[in-house]
C-alpha cells in the first residue's frame, strides 16, 4: 500500500469517513475514492456504494457502520469482481484481498461481502447476507471465511474464448501458431518450442521453434521473463536411443512482476493437460527452473532417468558376539576339579 493510503486508513478509522475505495495501480494498493457520512449508515449505503462499482474494474470497498467495538467503528469489507472484468484482474484482486484487510486492520472489520453483480453488494444484498447468516445451524466465523474463500476461487465467469478459472488452474487459449507448433513437435518436424503468455490478450503465444540441441538449451531461456519450453530430448539410455519430450517452466525469480509469476504458475497445469490430452504428446518430465544455466546435459539426463537407490536387506543376519572365543566345553578333563587322583 502507498503511504497516502496508509495515512488515509488511519484517518478513516477515527470515524470521519463513511466509505473508502481501494484499487490496484502499478502493483500498489492506492486510494480510489472516499465519501463522508451524510446520514445513518443504512440510508447512506446504496447512495455511496453502488456508483463506485465499475462494470469492468474490480475494487475493494470499506464501508463504515455506526456500531463500534473495542477498537472503534466497525466496517464492512466489500470485494467487487464484476463478471466482465479480465480474468487476470480477478485473480490479482483475489490474491491481494488479505493484504488489504491486514493493512486496514482486521479487528475493525465486522463482516465481508463478495459480489460479481451490483445486486450482490446493494443494501438489499447485504440484508440477504445477514438473513442467511442468521438461518438455523449457522456457520462459525471460520467456516464462513472458508466458504467465502472457496466462492472467490471458483466464481469466475467462463467466456466464449474458453479461458476459465477452476481450482485446478487458469486456462488461456493457445493461439493457432502455438497449436501448429505442437503438432509439428508431435511429428518431430521441430525439436524445440518456446511459448509465452500475452497478458493483454490473455492467450498463449508462440515465441519461436528454432532448432536446438542440449548445449544451446540454456541460451534459449530469457533472464528477465518467464517462458514455457517444450524440448525433444534425444539421448541414449542403457544402450537405447530415446526421444523424450521435456517440459520446462522457466521463471527468473523476482525479476518478473507478481502478476506475471501468478499467471504463469496458474496457467501451467491447464496447458500441460491440453498438450497431453488434446495433442496426445507424452511429457516424459516436467521441470521448473530459475536460470537457464541449470539445463546441463547431466541435469537433463538425471531428471529424465532418476538414479535408483539400492535398498539394504530387510532382515540382516545377526552378528555374533564380539572378540575371539573358543567353543565352550561341557565336560571337564581330569584334574580340573582340584583332585590329585
Curated annotation (Swiss-Prot):
Disordered: region residues: 314-341
Swiss-Prot/TrEMBL GO biological process terms: actin filament depolymerization; barbed-end actin filament capping; cell projection organization; positive regulation of neuron projection development; regulation of lamellipodium assembly
Residue ranges occupied by any ADF-H domain in the UniProt entry: 1-131, 169-305
Pfam families on file: Cofilin_ADF (PF00241)
SUPFAM superfamilies from the UniProt entry: Actin depolymerizing proteins
Annotated Gene Ontology cellular component terms: actin filament; myofibril; perinuclear region of cytoplasm; stereocilium
Chief subcellular location: cytoplasm
Residues recorded with modification Phosphoserine: 341
Keyword DNA-binding among record annotations: no
PTM sites of type Phosphotyrosine: 301
Family affiliation: Belongs to the actin-binding proteins ADF family. Twinfilin subfamily.
Self-association and partners: Interacts with G-actin; ADP-actin form and capping protein (CP). May also be able to interact with TWF1 and phosphoinositides, PI(4,5)P2. When bound to PI(4,5)P2, it is down-regulated. Interacts with MYO7A.
UniProt-recorded name of the protein: Twinfilin-2
Species name: Pongo abelii
Amino acid at each position: 500500500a502507498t503511504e497516502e493510503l496508509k495515512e488515509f486508513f488511519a484517518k478513516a478509522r477515527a470515524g470521519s469517513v463513511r466509505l473508502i475505495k481501494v484499487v490496484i495501480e502499478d502493483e500498489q494498493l492506492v486510494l480510489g475514492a472516499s465519501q463522508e457520512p451524510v446520514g445513518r449508515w443504512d440510508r447512506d449505503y446504496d447512495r455511496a456504494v453502488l456508483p463506485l462499482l465499475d462494470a469492468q474494474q474490480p475494487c475493494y470497498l470499506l464501508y463504515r457502520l455506526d456500531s463500534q467495538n473495542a477498537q472503534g467503528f466497525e466496517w464492512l469489507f466489500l470485494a467487487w469482481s464484476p463478471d466482465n472484468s479480465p480474468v487476470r484482474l480477478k485473480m490479482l484482486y483475489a490474491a491481494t484481498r488479505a493484504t488489504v484487510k491486514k493493512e486496514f486492520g482486521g479487528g475493525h472489520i465486522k463482516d465481508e461481502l463478495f459480489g460479481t453483480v451490483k445486486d450482490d453488494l446493494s443494501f438489499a444484498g447485504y440484508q440477504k447476507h445477514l438473513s442467511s447468516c442468521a438461518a438455523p445451524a449457522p456457520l462459525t466465523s471460520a467456516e464462513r471465511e472458508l466458504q467465502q474463500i472457496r466462492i472467490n476461487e471458483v466464481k469466475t465467469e467462463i467466456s466464449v474464448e474458453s479461458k476459465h478459472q477452476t481450482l485446478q488452474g487458469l486456462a488461456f487459449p493457445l493461439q493457432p501458431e502455438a497449436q501448429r507448433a505442437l503438432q509439428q513437435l508431435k511429428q518431430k518436424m521441430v525439436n524445440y518450442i518456446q511459448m509465452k503468455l500475452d497478458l493483454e490478450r490473455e492467450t498463449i503465444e508462440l515465441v519461436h521453434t528454432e532448432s536446438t540441441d542440449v548445449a544451446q538449451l540454456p541460451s534459449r531461456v530469457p533472464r528477465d521473463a518467464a517462458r514455457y519450453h517444450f524440448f525433444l530430448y534425444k539421448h541414449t539410455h542403457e544402450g537405447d536411443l530415446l526421444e523424450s519430450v521435456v517440459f520446462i517452466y522457466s521463471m527468473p525469480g523476482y525479476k518478473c512482476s507478481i502478476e506475471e509469476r501468478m499467471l504463469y504458475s496458474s496457467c501451467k497445469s491447464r496447458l500441460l493437460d491440453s498438450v497431453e490430452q488434446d495433442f496426445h504428446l507424452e511429457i516424459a518430465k516436467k521441470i521448473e527452473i530459475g536460470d537457464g544455466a541449470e539445463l546441463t546435459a547431466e541435469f537433463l539426463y538425471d531428471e529424465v532417468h532418476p538414479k535408483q537407490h539400492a535398498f539394504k536387506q530387510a532382515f540382516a543376519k545377526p552378528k555374533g558376539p564380539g572378540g575371539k572365543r573358543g567353543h565352550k566345553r561341557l565336560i571337564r578333563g581330569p584334574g580340573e576339579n582340584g583332585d590329585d587322583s
